[in-house]
Amino acid sequence: MNLSKIHHIAIIVSDYEAAKDFYVNKLGFSVIRENYRPERKDWKLDLRVNEYTELEIFAEENPPKRVNRPEACGLRHLAFCVESVEQTVNELAEVGIECEPIRVDDYTGKKMTFFHDSDGLPLELHE
């Protein structure tokens, strides 16, 4: 078996326009496809993260609230690899996104921090 790359990660959001603004206009992901699915009454937005990975965003009417405890079963957070955590934190601040204080990962020895998307999903920056 050769599972070489992650093709996509799918998330459900509560506010389609807020999520689209966050991931496209603030994080800079490009739109691949955007579709309203009337039979499901939801939006599906496919975004290019890099040459290998896509982020699928689903926005449906009245989704259940996200469990507020990150240790609940399921997706805990998304982590993005960056060359410089400091530079990326500064770039995020320029578009109004606050990050936690930068710290060193106890296991990798690399700099890291967290911020949150428009629904409170934790997003990590990791060198």
What do these predicted regions represent?
Residues 32-34, 41-43, 62-68, 101:
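A short, acidic/glycine-rich surface segment
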Residues 2, 35, 46, 89-127:
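Vicinal oxygen chelate
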Residues 22, 86-91:
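Short amphipathic alpha-helices within nucleic acid-binding modules
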Residues 50-54, 62-63, 85:
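Short, charged/polar surface micro-motifs in flexible loops or helix N-caps
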Residues 41, 74, 109:
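Exposed loop/turn and edge beta-strand positions of beta-sandwich/beta-sheet ligand-binding modules
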Residues 71-86:
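Mid-chain, well-packed structural core segment of small domains
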Residues 12-54, 94:
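Core segments of cupin and vicinal oxygen chelate
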Residues 1-18, 75-78:
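N-terminal beta-strand motif that seeds the catalytic metal site of vicinal oxygen chelate
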